[in-house]
From Swiss-Prot:
PROSITE patterns: MAPK, PROTEIN_KINASE_DOM, PROTEIN_KINASE_ST. Activated by threonine and tyrosine phosphorylation by either of two dual specificity kinases, MAP2K4 and MAP2K7. Inhibited by dual specificity phosphatases, such as DUSP1. Inhibited by SERPINB3. The lineage of its organism: Eukaryota, Metazoa, Chordata, Craniata, Vertebrata. A motif (TXY) lies at residues 183-185. The TXY motif contains the threonine and tyrosine residues whose phosphorylation activates the MAP kinases. This is Mitogen-activated protein kinase 8. Changing residue 55 to D: Abolished protein kinase activity. GO terms for biological process: cellular response to amino acid starvation; cellular response to lipopolysaccharide; cellular response to mechanical stimulus; cellular response to oxidative stress; cellular response to reactive oxygen species; cellular senescence; energy homeostasis; Fc-epsilon receptor signaling pathway. It catalyses: L-seryl-[protein] + ATP = O-phospho-L-seryl-[protein] + ADP + H(+); L-threonyl-[protein] + ATP = O-phospho-L-threonyl-[protein] + ADP + H(+). The modification S-nitrosocysteine is found at residue 116. Its cofactor is Mg(2+).
Length: 427
């Protein structure tokens, strides 16, 4: 594309302290969140005739870590295509050459709210179960490609008013290696698994602890383990769940083991005490979902010893979840990631910049006339299986009144105010 023609395709608008220079197809930009990794705006796509979210990466070439994170996010979003993972619609840059290249814009599906708002609602069993089912389907799809999300938290999970749920933000995702020697400083503290807190290394079911924390928060309407730092976080966990057994202690590094063994010993509480029936909604007559089933699932996810924690496949088959089971969702073909050494790559900033520029140019070429060519639409229609999903006629728990503003809250702090409201049909 010639320089003059490229210039004519873009316009600039001030968003807070930042300037968004976007393709003219994107109109009516409105800020909806900001954070360490970038600023997110809602916009209207005149070509696709739909609302979208545009994320401007924050200084992607500031250092090698930022550059590597940006490259990883682009590669993973391009490869992953599942109804419970946020869909990539477009990627572009207003710069005209590699030498000028400095800004990356990622266009994604726009959702109605993040899970932080939904957690404050009184959900019935159908809606809670269905939201968790979708979460697990998205996680399994990532795990099937060896991708550990590591950053699951309510603000990284978004929903629409029809109860559709999607996982987002892959800037901190990592492909699973053989050594599992991974940095523990990743997940928002409250949702960190014990193996992360204790620097033990981790495998895929580190994400199941995070789901357990989120589910517990949906039940209790409060954070389960609100630690101020790693030490306080560990103390909060063992005070409630109990000090782990000696076999677990043997797995710890010597210095960590010494500290943990010298802490006061806690018996912990039963899950009936932590999550009494009074916190749960009434048992479901239609799908036979009960508080006892929900509590049993929590007890299998919130397990300190990862070797005894439930896997995503086991969670999907749990009685509280499997009423929604659909092979097309839970057993979708794994994404094909061409760069098998995605997380082992080490480059200079300039080398990362060139790699990212090539990715952006490739995606620009593939999205000239709409969504990415060669990739199925991320907005696949919901498949209704044998189990009836929460009825659209139900006025109980409808998220449509939760907020008038949409959101796509990746690593950003959503600007939306949580508002009480009913949560609508789930499928």
């Amino acid at each position: 594309m010639s320089r003059s023609k490229r210039d004519n395709n873009f316009y600039s608008v001030e968003i807070g302290d930042s300037t968004f220079t976007v393709l003219k197809r994107y109109q009516n930009l409105k800020p909806i969140g900001s954070g360490a990794q970038g600023i997110v705006c809602a916009a209207y796509d005149a070509i696709l005739e739909r609302n979208v979210a545009i994320k401007k990466l924050s200084r992607p070439f500031q250092n090698q870590t930022h550059a590597k994170r940006a490259y990883r996010e682009l590669v993973l979003m391009k490869c992953v295509n599942h109804k419970n993972i946020i869909g990539l619609l477009n990627v572009f840059t207003p710069q005209k050459s590699l030498e000028e290249f400095q800004d990356v814009y990622i266009v994604m599906e726009l959702m109605d709210a993040n899970l932080c708002q939904v957690i404050q609602m009184e959900l019935d069993h159908e809606r809670m179960s269905y939201l968790l089912y979708q979460m697990l389907c998205g996680i399994k799809h990532l795990h099937s490609a060896g991708i550990i999300h590591r950053d699951l938290k309510p603000s990284n999970i978004v929903v629409k008013s029809d109860c559709t749920l999607k996982i987002l933000d892959f800037g901190l995702a990592r492909t699973a290696g053989t050594s599992f020697m991974m940095t523990p400083y990743v997940v928002t503290r409250y949702y960190r698994a014990p193996e992360v807190i204790l620097g033990m290394g981790y495998k895929e079911n580190v994400d199941l602890w995070s789901v357990g924390c989120i589910m517990g928060e949906m039940v209790c309407h409060k954070i389960l383990f609100p630690g101020r730092d790693y030490i306080d976080q560990w103390n909060k966990v063992i005070e409630q769940l109990g000090t782990p057994c000696p076999e677990f202690m043997k797995k710890l590094q010597p210095t960590v083991r010494t500290y943990v063994e010298n802490r006061p010993k806690y018996a912990g509480y039963s899950f009936e005490k932590l999550f009494p029936d009074v916190l749960f909604p009434a048992d479901s007559e239609h799908n036979k979902l009960k508080a006892s089933q929900a509590r049993d699932l929590l007890s299998k996810m919130l397990v300190i010893d990862a070797s005894k924690r439930i896997s995503v496949d086991e969670a999907l088959q749990h009685p509280y979840i499997n009423v929604w089971y659909d092979p097309s969702e839970a057993e979708a073909p794994p994404p094909k990631i061409p760069d098998k050494q995605l997380d082992e790559r080490e480059h200079t900033i300039e080398e990362w910049k060139e790699l990212i520029y090539k990715e952006v140019m490739d995606l620009e070429e593939r999205t000239k006339n709409g969504v990415i060519r060669g990739q199925p639409s991320p907005l696949g229609a919901a498949v209704i299986n044998g189990s009836q999903h929460p009825s659209s006629s139900s006025s109980v728990n409808d998220v449509s009144s939760m907020s008038t503003d949409p959101t796509l809250a990746s690593d950003t702090d959503s600007s939306l105010e949580a508002a009480a409201g009913p949560l609508g049909c789930c499928r």
